């Protein structure tokens, strides 16, 4: 399963974001999926 908007993700080990989202690690407490612009 892939992670969608505002769900936790890990760019190095998974879970990976769904198509159309990228893993952003700028927010606390960890990485979250954000929509691609």
From Swiss-Prot:
The keyword Ubl conjugation does not apply. Binds at site 4 of sodium channels (Nav) and inhibits the fast inactivation of cockroach channels. This toxin is active only on insects Has a potent activity against S.litura larvae. One of its GO terms (cellular component) is extracellular region. The presence of a 'disulfide through disulfide knot' structurally defines this protein as a knottin. Disulfide bonds join 2-18, 9-23, 17-33, 25-31. GO terms for biological process: envenomation resulting in negative regulation of voltage-gated sodium channel activity in another organism. Keywords: Amidation, Disulfide bond, Ion channel impairing toxin, Knottin, Neurotoxin, Secreted, Toxin, Voltage-gated sodium channel impairing toxin. Expressed by the venom gland. The record marks 8, 12, 22, 24, 26, 34 as: Pharmacophore. Pfam families: Toxin_7. InterPro entries: Beta/delta-agatoxin_fam. This is Delta-amaurobitoxin-Pl1d. Belongs to the neurotoxin 07 (Beta/delta-agtx) family. 01 (aga-2) subfamily. GO terms for molecular function: sodium channel inhibitor activity; toxin activity.
